[in-house]
């Protein structure tokens, strides 16, 4: 077994995600041994992905490997003569991270058969011509339509079903040149009218006018048509990062429902000290439920022990992870309490959380520094590696995207007038982005309560008994 694991380790050093085609890269004995012991899982006959024993039935391994598998399978079967559809290319350009139920690949070598994959996902290789030039996506190695060509050839339905993704991609176009090259080369008057209408919908009349006038100048009968069913509240500006536009559109799309369903805000708190005492009274209950949601085993006695300072990390608690986590939660809770005090005294809630959330995170993990498990530098800044959530189809943003997204989140919080929207969407967006390697759920619930305080709402505990419902709601909003 040790020899087989060594072979797997060599493959993992070479590739970010191990996808194997039969015995091409590993001997049959090693393959069989790794498969029998849970270190590999079969995706389809003759194709395997790396896993860990005990993860059978857990979708995380598959969702983590999904796009790597698609890219390698297509490259082996089709060479470079393939690409995703225009619609699915736009999904990826827009920063949509949800694993789709069906992937459609276009290729002159396509056989028009649907191949079942793991966990109710499927792959269709459709016989079709592909663009003269395809874009090689750097993260997974996928072949995509070039952005401008994908917008031109997207289905009309895409602009209605995937409004956020479509508008995000439109906002990534600086001028009309690349769009016009595609339209002029293929003489697509109907598509020209649709894409011109799409640009006008997001507030970019300059590109819309340029498309219409240029194509008419070439002799095409262009009739502009808006493919969307609604209008964004504010015009979208050119933005290189898709995540900036995507987050703003998601916020706009979700906020009205929060306002509709949430009770009216109590308003400004006059008795600041009284409110803070009520927060203190919630500590034990909040710590128990918040940590239990994350899977830690903490008792009321342990929570009280770390609260009163009867905690000796250098002695009996040094190897007790639950005690370290509980102490960190207490320290972070006190930091959040300080932020709430500033908010109640008049500081803008978004600005307060922007300034203080690194301190919350630092305090959450300082006990691990105290006992030497973590280094101080580990607590500085956002994550630098990819993180995955067990179970959900949603894959958190990549590290570069996190740095694009977090300033947008705090800008949205700063400028959002309704405290309930700040609370609900602030919490959801924080978890959606997942800016840290660990502790995102706890941090998200701290954001929730800091923003609730800004509207005079009471500190709210998410009970562990409703964990499944809570997680399902977060997942539903993410996909």
Residue ranges with predicted function:
Residues 47:
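Conserved two-metal-ion catalytic palm core of "right-hand" nucleic acid polymerases
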Residues 1-29, 35-43, 51, 55-479:
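FIC/Doc superfamily catalytic core
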């Amino acid at each position: 077994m040790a020899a087989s694991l060594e072979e797997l380790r060599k493959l993992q050093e070479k590739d970010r995600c191990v996808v194997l085609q039969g015995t091409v890269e590993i001997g049959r004995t090693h393959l069989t041994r790794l498969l029998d012991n849970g270190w590999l899982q079969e995706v389809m006959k003759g194709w395997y992905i790396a896993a860990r024993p005990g993860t059978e039935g857990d979708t995380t391994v598959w969702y983590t490997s999904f796009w790597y598998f698609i890219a390698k399978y297509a490259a082996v079967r089709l060479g470079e003569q393939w690409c995703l559809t225009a619609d699915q290319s736009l999904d990826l350009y827009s920063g949509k991270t949800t694993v789709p139920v069906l992937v459609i690949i276009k290729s002159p070598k396509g056989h028009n058969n649907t191949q079942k994959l793991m966990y109710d996902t499927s792959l269709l290789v459709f016989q079709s011509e592909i663009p003269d030039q395809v874009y090689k996506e750097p993260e997974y190695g996928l072949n995509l339509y070039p952005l401008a060509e994908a917008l031109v050839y997207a289905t009309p339905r895409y602009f209605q079903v995937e409004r956020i993704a479509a508008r995000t991609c439109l906002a990534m176009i600086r001028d009309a040149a690349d769009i016009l090259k595609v339209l002029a080369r293929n003489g697509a008057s109907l598509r020209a009218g649709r894409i011109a209408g799409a640009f006008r919908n997001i507030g970019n009349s300059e590109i819309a006018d340029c498309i219409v006038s240029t194509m008419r100048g070439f002799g095409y009968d262009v009739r502009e048509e808006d493919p969307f069913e609604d209008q964004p509240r504010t015009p979208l500006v050119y933005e290189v990062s898709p995540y900036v536009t995507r987050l703003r559109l998601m916020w706009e799309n979700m906020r009205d429902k929060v306002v509709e369903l949430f009770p009216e805000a109590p308003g400004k708190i006059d008795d600041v000290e009284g409110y803070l005492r009520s927060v203190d009274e919630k500590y034990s209950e909040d710590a128990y439920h918040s940590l239990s949601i994350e899977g830690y085993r903490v008792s009321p006695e342990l929570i009280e022990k770390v609260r009163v300072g009867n905690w000796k990390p250098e002695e009996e608690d040094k190897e007790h992870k639950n005690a370290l986590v509980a102490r960190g939660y207490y320290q972070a809770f006190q930091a959040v309490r300080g932020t709430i005090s500033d908010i109640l005294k008049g500081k803008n809630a978004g600005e307060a959380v922007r300034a203080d959330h690194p301190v919350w995170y630092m305090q959450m993990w300082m006990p691990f520094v105290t006992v030497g498990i973590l280094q101080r530098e580990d607590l500085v800044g956002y994550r630098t590696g990819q993180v995955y959530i067990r179970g959900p189809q949603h894959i958190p943003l990549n590290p570069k995207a996190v740095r694009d997204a977090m300033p947008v989140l705090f800008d949205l919080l700063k400028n959002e007038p309704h405290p309930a929207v700040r609370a609900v969407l602030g919490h959801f967006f924080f978890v959606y982005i997942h800016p840290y390697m660990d502790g995102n759920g706890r941090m998200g619930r701290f954001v929730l309560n800091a923003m609730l305080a800004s509207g005079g709402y009471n500190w709210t505990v998410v009970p562990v008994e409703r964990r499944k419902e809570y997680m399902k709601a977060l997942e539903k909003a993410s996909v």
